[in-house]
Each structure stands twice: as structure tokens, then as C-alpha cells.
Amino acid sequence: AFGGYIGENYGWQTNFFTLFIFGAIVFSLNYVYSPETIKNKNKRLTFRATFLDFRYLFGEISFLYFAGVSSIQAAFFFSMAGFMPYQFERLGASPTEFGLWFSLTSIGYIIGNIVSNKYSSWLGLERLSLLGCFWCLVSIALMCLSEIPQISTPLTLASACFMFGLGNGLILANVLVLALSSVKQKGVASASGLLGAMQMLCGAILGSLIVFIGGDSEFWLALVVLFILSIISILCCYRGGLWSKILRSKCQLVCNGN
């Protein structure tokens, strides 16, 4: 929220120094307060073991579907931080104002997480994730309103960003649980690492793609890319839910047979 203010008043280089300070604080807190989870410290991690885990994960259809949803939705947020400043600037917002307006996305994400935590046991993880995907699709469509001259204000776009953050909050935590629960216990750690890497990779690719096709100067181009990927995200979430139900049915049949 304060990156725009810092950059506008103290220079953009100061933002990197600020990130370094906060990164050092987070690292120190994790080092001091996060307990070690490895019980057998003599066990060594080898490249071969990691490769075998990844080969197993790429064969798990449910994991791939939910990992796809997580990667796409996380990439949306990362890429928006790259092209949204240009649209807010065209709407007359200063860098400081952009930071404050765009912070509504994070506030929406926090609220989405709270709603998810409260209702996931009632609606189910798959259903709530699918609802969040549809919500994000609608919010991306509403971003088009910022292109209509009569209502093209920073508030219009920031409201759509808030809705997008809310949908993101409904999705990411749930699909993370769904992805990790769809693999065997021994592959959970590798699955978590692979999932994080996929999110970063998709974010970098999507951000570069949008700038490459001119989405930073033509806002509608960026929205078209987000809209198409949002539909793919919905399909992945739906298919992942179907595969999870099939696997649960098979496990139930095996248990009943025994």
C-alpha cells in the first residue's frame, strides 16, 4: 500500500531497500520461531529422490488440476501488480494513490480467506473453490467498466480489484489443501514445493506475456488474457473435483471390499 508513496517521495530505489529490510525481518522471525519439521536429520535429500517424487506428482491428475488452478490464480495477482499501475495512471491516479487503491485487492483477499475459513466445512472445498473461480471471472469482466468514459474512475477499477481479491481468497487456500490431499503422504513436501514453484513460474510468464502483447498500454488486451485463463481455471477446478470424487469412490469400494 505504501510502495507508491515511498517511490514517489524517496525514489523507486528506496522500495528495494524497504523490501530488503522487511525480508530480513521475516527471515529472522521464521528462523527463531518456526520449529524444524525434519525428525530424521541424518536423512539426506538427493536429486534422484526429488526427481522420483516429481515424476509421481506429474502422474496425479487431481494434483495437476488443482495445481493449475492455484498457479493461474496466483499468477493473476502477480501480473496485475505489473500492468495495473499503467491503467490507474491513465485514470489520473498518482503512484501514492495507486498504492492505496490497489491495496483493496489485498484487503479483499484477507476477507476471502476469512469467509473461506468459516464456510469451507459447510460448502466443501471443491464447491467453494469453484465459486471463487466464477467470482474472479465476474470481477475481471467488471474491470472493463474502467474503459467506459462515463464511469472510468480509480474507484471503479479498485472496486473490481477488491472483488478479485475476495475471489482469490476463496480459492487459493482451498485448492492448496485439495492439491496436497490428493497425493500420498510421502509426496506432500515435494508437492508443496512444486506448487510454489509453479505459482512463481506462471506469475513470471503471465506478467511477461501481458507486457509483450501490449497489455500495459492497451488495458483490454490484458483483460482478454485474464478472462481466457480464468475460464481455464474454472475448467481445471471442475475437472479436479470430478477426479477427486472418482478417487474417493474407488477408495471406498476398496475399503468396503476388504
Predicted regions and their residues:
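Helix-loop-helix hairpin linking two adjacent transmembrane segments in secondary transporters
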Residues: 1-32
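Helix-to-loop junctions at the C-terminal end of transmembrane segments
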Residues: 112-126
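C-terminal transmembrane helical hairpin of 12-TM major facilitator-type secondary transporters
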Residues: 126-175
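Interfacial helix-cap and linker-helix signal at transmembrane-aqueous boundaries
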Residues: 1-10, 88-89, 119-120, 210-218
